[in-house]
Amino acid sequence: MVCDGMGGAKAGNIASRLAVESFLTVLQQQAPQDWGQNPHELLTRCVEGANQAVFQRSIHDPDCTGMGTTMVAALVLEEKAYVLNVGDSRAYLIRESEGIQRITRDHSVVEALVSRGELSQEAARFHPQKNLITRALGAEARVKCDLYDLTLLPGDFLLLCSDGLSNQMDDQEISYEVLHGGPTETCCERLLQLAMSRGAPDNVTVVLLQK
């Protein structure tokens, strides 16, 4: 799971931490052996619980007014991965024989322009409004998340990241580093170093899983 908080440094950190903790609290209320029974319903409940926790804190704590967070998460059960996202943190599937595939679609101003054919993916990375998101966890009393189902093959990589990475590196660069970067931990460190060297903020987050 990756959450990228907003609303100032302090409030953003609170939002992202609270979202993760609340999500896991709801998830752990159901026995792990039952997670596969209805994963979409389970993930939706987890997101709704996290959203309520962040939203209630934002309206009752003056220091947290207006805070929110993105969220991208994956529930991996054997060869199946169930991915959710809110905001502009991303999930990628990287397969050596096929390259990289972006699984999620950003809830952002520039993504809407891309989907309408008014902006290319490359131009979107440098657009002045690239950081404006249209959906965030905790921004309102209810939240809608997007859900995706994947089948993972042996050797596949599933990468989750905040926009600090995707704003600095294009998909092909990410794919190359994952496929040629060695062990997953080493690869994550390399991706973080590259993003930071190109001017990414301190809160770049990457999670990498290999099947």
Where are these regions (language model features)?
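PP2C/PPM-type serine/threonine phosphatase catalytic domain
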Residues: 1-211
